[in-house]
């Protein structure tokens, strides 16, 4: 039996994210002989949520399973349709009285090449949704104790590096992979932990390039930091980047035998043409 080869793609953000995945994923899949492709798609539609049309685009590009995050519930016109797809996994740790608790699932168990594989999506406590979420540490421990799978891949969608590091300390060796998402900035700490789990604080995003502020129009972000004025962030149209984590698992031992960070950056001249100095007053 061949080893399981997995690719996890960071937060898909807007048109740039959809396009770079559609253009490059077939090449990556062939190069790495992938068995399983997972992507966090919570920012796919205008930076917030996932529409039915964009769900179909990601599926056509070759993504097998989709995880979500704190923007899961923004595309309300398609919410029930998208979340009830068998391959879409929304955050697990929701309060039962949360409005959308009944839609979708937070963890999914399936078989691949004779192995039972579970994918789980969790929101960190550092995500400011106190009215909606339960503790991710407690919820994952409950799930781990069921011991119902050979491989367990966790998308931990959290704000702070400290919470993600603490999460890794708790679940090192109890799950196959802990893949941080949400901040859109790839961290430089991909590793196989002492007890054998894949860990990275943040995978990064698949979206606009360096001419954006984590995917958004820089003018609006700069204004927020200078004046405190909040407004809807437009998705930047400057360049593109793809960030992902590849890992290979031995099908005989269920141990991770190889990891690699995948990064493609396609920036353009729009970045050089912009000068934001005078936005500061």
UniProtKB/Swiss-Prot annotation:
Tagged with keyword Cell membrane: no
Alphabetized GO MF terms: 2',3'-cyclic-nucleotide 3'-phosphodiesterase activity; metal ion binding
Enzyme Commission designation: 3.1.-.-
Tree of life domain: Bacteria
NCBIfam families: TIGR00282 family metallophosphoesterase
Gene3D superfamilies listed in its UniProt record: 3.60.21.10
Keywords: Hydrolase, Iron, Metal-binding
Keyword Lyase carried by entry: no
Family: Belongs to the YmdB-like family.
Cofactor or coenzyme needed: Fe(3+)
Disulfide pairings: none
Name this polypeptide is given: Putative phosphatase/phosphodiesterase MG246
Sequence positions that bind Fe cation 1: 11, 42-43, 184
Residues at the active site: 71
Coiled-coil ranges per UniProt: none
One Pfam family in the UniProt entry: YmdB
Residues bound to Fe cation 2: 42, 70, 157, 182
């Amino acid at each position: 039996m061949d080893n399981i080869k997995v690719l996890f793609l960071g937060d898909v953000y807007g048109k740039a994210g959809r396009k770079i995945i559609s253009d490059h994923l077939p090449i990556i899949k062939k190069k790495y002989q992938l068995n399983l492709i997972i992507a966090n798609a919570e920012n796919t539609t205008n930076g917030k949520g996932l529409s039915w049309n964009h769900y179909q685009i990601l599926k056509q590009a070759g993504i097998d399973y989709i995880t979500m995050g704190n923007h899961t519930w923004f595309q309300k016109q398609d919410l029930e349709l998208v979340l009830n797809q068998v391959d879409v996994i929304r955050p697990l740790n929701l309060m039962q009285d949360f409005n959308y608790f009944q839609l979708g699932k937070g963890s999914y168990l399936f078989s691949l090449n004779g192995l039972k594989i579970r994918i789980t999506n969790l929101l960190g406590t550092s995500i400011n949704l106190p009215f909606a979420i339960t503790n991710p540490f407690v919820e994952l421990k409950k799930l781990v104790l069921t011991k119902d799978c050979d491989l367990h891949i966790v998308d931990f969608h959290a704000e702070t590096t400290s919470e993600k590091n603490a999460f890794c300390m708790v679940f090192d060796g109890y799950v196959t992979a802990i893949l941080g998402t949400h901040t859109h900035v790839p961290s430089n700490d991909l590793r196989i932990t002492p007890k054998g789990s894949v860990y990275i604080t943040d995978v990064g995003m698949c979206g606009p390039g360096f001419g954006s502020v984590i995917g958004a129009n820089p003018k609006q972000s700069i204004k927020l930091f200078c004046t405190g004025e909040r407004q809807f962030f437009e998705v930047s149209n400057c360049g593109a980047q793809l960030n992902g984590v590849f890992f290979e698992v031995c099908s005989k031992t269920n141990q991770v035998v190889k990891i690699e960070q995948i990064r493609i950056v396609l920036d353009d001249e729009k970045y050089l043409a912009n000068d934001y100095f005078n936005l500061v007053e």
